[in-house]
From Swiss-Prot:
Cytoplasmic side: 147-509
Transmembrane segments: 124-146
Protein name: Activin receptor type-1
Function (record text): Bone morphogenetic protein (BMP) type I receptor that is involved in a wide variety of biological processes, including bone, heart, cartilage, nervous, and reproductive system development and regulation. As a type I receptor, forms heterotetrameric receptor complexes with the type II receptors AMHR2, ACVR2A ors ACVR2B. Upon binding of ligands such as BMP7 or BMP9 to the heteromeric complexes, type II receptors transphosphorylate ACVR1 intracellular domain. In turn, ACVR1 kinase domain is activated and subsequently phosphorylates SMAD1/5/8 proteins that transduce the signal.
Residue numbers bearing the Phosphoserine modification: S501
Domain GS: 178-207
Catalysed reaction, written as an equation: L-threonyl-[receptor-protein] + ATP = O-phospho-L-threonyl-[receptor-protein] + ADP + H(+); L-seryl-[receptor-protein] + ATP = O-phospho-L-seryl-[receptor-protein] + ADP + H(+)
Subcellular location, principal: membrane
Compartment(s) of residence: Membrane
Keyword set, alphabetical order: ATP-binding, Glycoprotein, Kinase, Magnesium, Manganese, Membrane, Metal-binding, Nucleotide-binding, Phosphoprotein, Receptor, Serine/threonine-protein kinase, Signal, Transferase, Transmembrane, Transmembrane helix
InterPro entries xrefs: Activin_recp, GS_dom, Kinase-like_dom_sf, Prot_kinase_dom, Protein_kinase_ATP_BS, Ser/Thr_kinase_AS, Snake_toxin-like_sf, TGFB_receptor
Cofactor annotation: Mg(2+); Mn(2+)
C-alpha cells in the first residue's frame, strides 16, 4: 500500500509534466524596449518602456477598441500573451524597440485557426490522454491512497486555519478562484507594486454588480458594489469632474500607496452604461462611511478619539514623506483634506480618500507635479494663504502646510465629540458659527484672513488632560504663518506620545 502511495505522485508528474526550466528561468538584467502606447492607460504619453510590447483589440458595447502599450515586467504579460484570441478580445505581444508599431491584433473568424489555438487544443488533448492513462493505472490504489492522504492531512491541519480562513475585509476562496486579496497581493510583488495591470483592472470593473447608492455629491455618486461576493466601493465621477478621475487613476497606478490609513485602490475603468460614458474608481468598501457622517451619530471616549486622530495623522505623514528605493514613492500633498474625505474602518481607525487634487514632488528630479485639474479645494477648510492668494504655488512645502491647516480643523471636529466628565458638544463643521452653510470665498477670507478667527475651544476641554493636549496641538496647526505650523510627522509623534501616556496612566491605576 505504501508503494501505491509513492507511485501516485510519480504518475501525476508523468501525466502533468512541469514546464521546462528554460521557459520559467528568470532573465538576468532583462532588456527594456521602447513601445508605442495608444489608449486610455497612456494618458498624454505616446510611448512607454517595458520588457514586452503588446497590441490588443477588444469589443466594447459593439465598438472595436484598439490599444497598444507595454508590460513593465515580463511576468505581467505572460498569461495575457499566451491566451488564444477569442471572439471578444485578441492580444499580440512582441519584444523589440517599437515592435508593436505595425502590429494590429485581429479577432478570429470562422474557418480561420490561429497557431496559438492549435497548440492549445493539442495540449488539451495530450492532457486528457495522460489523465485517462493515469486513472487506469491507479484505479485499484486511488481509494485507499486518498483515504490515507486525507487522514494525514487532517492530523496536520491547525484548527485555527479553519476558524480564521479570511483576510480582514476580503473573503478567501478555493485555490484557482482569484480574489481581491490575491490580486492586490500580486500587484504589490510584481511591476511597480502600485496597482493592478490595466487589463486586470478592466476585467474586475466589468464583473462588478452595483447594489446601492451610498453617497452623492458634486463629483458624482458612490455605490456599494459586489465582485465575486465581496463588497467594493464604486465612485462614479460626473463628466465635468473627469480630471479628478484621471488624476486619481494616474496617481494610484504610478505610485506605491499601500498603507492602512490610505483608502485601498482596486481598479479604474471608463465604461458605457445607459448610452452615457461613466468614469469608475473602484476601492475597498468601508460600511461605516465618512468621518463626517460618523461623528454626527457617534460620541467618542478617549481611546477611540485618539485612535481616529492618530490614524489620520499616520495616513497624512505617509502621503507627505518621500520614500526612496524600488518600493518607494514621491512626496504627496492631498489639498482637499476634510472629514468628508476620511473614511472610518471597522477597527476604529480611519483612512484618507479622494486624491483627485493631489500634488506630487520628487527630490531627485525636483519636479512639482500639480496635475491639470481646475477644481479647487473645499472653501471651509482653506488655509489663510490660499484664501488671500499669497501661497507659493511653485513650492511643494506650501501644499503640505495647507494640509496641516485642514488637519487641525478635522482634529477640532473629532475632539468636540469626545466625552469628558459626562459632557460632549454636538457635531458642527468648522466655523459653523461665523459663516453660512455653503460659505463663499469672500466669507472665508474675511473670517480667516481679515478677522483671523479660529474655531472656538470649549472651556470644558481644559479640565481633561487629553483634550487640553489636543487643543494645544490644533492651535499649532492654525498659525497664520504657514512655515510655523507643525509637520505631519511631528503631529504623529505627538499624538503617539499622548496615546502612550494614556496607556501608562491606565497601567498605574
Amino acid at each position: 500500500m505504501v508503494d501505491g502511495v509513492m507511485i501516485l505522485p510519480v504518475l501525476v508528474m508523468i501525466a502533468f509534466p512541469f514546464p521546462s526550466m528554460e521557459d520559467e528561468k528568470p532573465k538576468v538584467n532583462p532588456k527594456l524596449y521602447m513601445c508605442v502606447c495608444e489608449g486610455l492607460s497612456c494618458g498624454d504619453e505616446a510611448h512607454c518602456e517595458g520588457q514586452q510590447c503588446f497590441s490588443s483589440l477588444s469589443i466594447n458595447d459593439g465598438f472595436h477598441v484598439y490599444q497598444k502599450g507595454c508590460f513593465q515586467v515580463y511576468e505581467q504579460g505572460k498569461m495575457t500573451c499566451k491566451t488564444p484570441p477569442s471572439p471578444g478580445q485578441a492580444v499580440e505581444c512582441c519584444q523589440g524597440d517599437w515592435c508593436n508599431r505595425n502590429i494590429t491584433a485581429q479577432l478570429p473568424t470562422k474557418g480561420k485557426s490561429f497557431p496559438g489555438t492549435q497548440n492549445f487544443h493539442l495540449e488539451v488533448g495530450l492532457i486528457i490522454l495522460s489523465v485517462v492513462f493515469a486513472v487506469c493505472l491507479l484505479a485499484c490504489l486511488l481509494g485507499v491512497a486518498l483515504r490515507k492522504f486525507k487522514r494525514r492531512n487532517q492530523e496536520r491541519l491547525n484548527p485555527r486555519d479553519v476558524e480564521y480562513g479570511t483576510i480582514e475585509g476580503l473573503i478567501t476562496t478555493n485555490v484557482g478562484d482569484s480574489t481581491l486579496a490575491d490580486l492586490l497581493d500580486h500587484s504589490c510583488t510584481s511591476g511597480s507594486g502600485s496597482g493592478l495591470p490595466f487589463l486586470v483592472q478592466r476585467t474586475v470593473a466589468r464583473q462588478i454588480t452595483l447594489l446601492e447608492c451610498v453617497g452623492k455629491g458634486r463629483y458624482g455618486e458612490v455605490w456599494r458594489g459586489s465582485w465575486q461576493g465581496e463588497n467594493v466601493a464604486v465612485k462614479i465621477f460626473s463628466s465635468r469632474d473627469e480630471k479628478s478621475w484621471f488624476r486619481e487613476t494616474e496617481l494610484y497606478n504610478t505610485v506605491m500607496l499601500r498603507h492602512e490609513n490610505i483608502l485601498g485602490f482596486i481598479a479604474s475603468d471608463m465604461t458605457s452604461r445607459h448610452s452615457s460614458t461613466q468614469l469608475w474608481l473602484i476601492t475597498h468598501y468601508h460600511e461605516m462611511g465618512s468621518l463626517y457622517d460618523y461623528l454626527q451619530l457617534t460620541t467618542l471616549d478617549t481611546v477611540s478619539c485618539l485612535r481616529i486622530v492618530l490614524s489620520i495623522a499616520s495616513g497624512l505623514a505617509h502621503l507627505h514623506i518621500e520614500i526612496f528605493g524600488t518600493q518607494g514613492k514621491p512626496a504627496i500633498a492631498h489639498r482637499d483634506l476634510k472629514s468628508k474625505n476620511i473614511l472610518v474602518k471597522k477597527n476604529g481607525q480611519c483612512c484618507i480618500a479622494d486624491l483627485g487634487l493631489a500634488v506630487m514632488h520628487s527630490q531627485s528630479t525636483n519636479q512639482l507635479d500639480v496635475g491639470n485639474n481646475p477644481r479647487v479645494g473645499t472653501k471651509r477648510y482653506m488655509a489663510p494663504e490660499v484664501l488671500d492668494e499669497t501661497i507659493q504655488v511653485d513650492c511643494f512645502d506650501s501644499y503640505k502646510r495647507v494640509d496641516i491647516w485642514a488637519f487641525g480643523l478635522v482634529l477640532w471636529e473629532v475632539a468636540r465629540r469626545m466625552v469628558s466628565n459626562g459632557i460632549v458638544e454636538d457635531y458642527k463643521p468648522p466655523f459653523y458659527d461665523v459663516v453660512p452653510n455653503d460659505p463663499s470665498f469672500e466669507d472665508m477670507r474675511k473670517v480667516v484672513c481679515v478677522d483671523q478667527q479660529r474655531p472656538n475651544i470649549p472651556n470644558r476641554w481644559f479640565s481633561d488632560p487629553t483634550l487640553t493636549s489636543l487643543a494645544k496641538l490644533m492651535k499649532e496647526c492654525w498659525y497664520q504663518n504657514p512655515s510655523a505650523r507643525l509637520t505631519a510627522l511631528r503631529i504623529k509623534k505627538t499624538l503617539t506620545k499622548i496615546d502612550n501616556s494614556l496607556d501608562k496612566l491606565k497601567t498605574d491605576c
